[in-house]
Amino acid sequence: MLGKNVEDFTVQDKERIGVVLADSGFSGYLRVKDILPMLESMYHKFQKEDFLEMCKKYQLPLDKKIKEFSMGMKRKLQIAAAVSHGADVLFMDESTAGLDVMARDEMLDILREYMETPGRSILISSHISTDLERICDDIYMIDEGKILLHEETDKLLDQYGLLKVKADQYEALDKAYILAHKKEEYGYSCLTNERQYYQENYPDITIEKGKIDDVIIMMKRGQQE
């Protein structure tokens, strides 16, 4: 990470990393202005003016106790704190969980703005697949510490597909591009990373466009080829 082994990280290297967790991370009895001296003492490169500007932009009152903030406001505060010390890498763990549709959309806009600066990266752990589809360049599916799938998001959405076939169709199917299959009442569902190949060569079978949720279910519950 950041071009070096994490075991060799210096304090300065660690300050280039920001973290946003599902919890606010701050005591609810504190106000935003109360955490300013904390951030200043924790980070050598804390940019107070930038932090205050973000609080103003995100409409975070400085004199209000954090416990009175909405869930969306708490997430915005976390992001403001996480990026206000020159962070080049942002770790986010289920940070949009529990937010309503509007709050999640605002969060994604904030992250897109953060990524406009060259050299920055975001690592997002989330079970909300629509968020991943909208903002991530790459998708990793991890189960029990094992990477089951790594794919570019655009490729996953454009080239992956779900085939719905009867038993006899499945037997006659060229399985060269089938990643996994699952027994269904009607026959089989099959995950492919070459949807166009099957559309061109098997016009009689039902083929749906791939979605992250479909891929997750098939890679987890289906039988891999």
Name each model-derived stretch.
Residues V101-A103:
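Helix N-cap at the start of a conserved alpha-helix in ABC-type nucleotide-binding domains
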Residues M1-D8, Q12-D13:
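Conserved ABC transporter NBD signature motif
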Residues L108-T192:
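ABC transporter nucleotide-binding domain
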Residues E15, V19-Q78:
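ABC-family P-loop ATPase nucleotide-binding domains
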Residues A180-E225:
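C-terminal coupling/interaction segments
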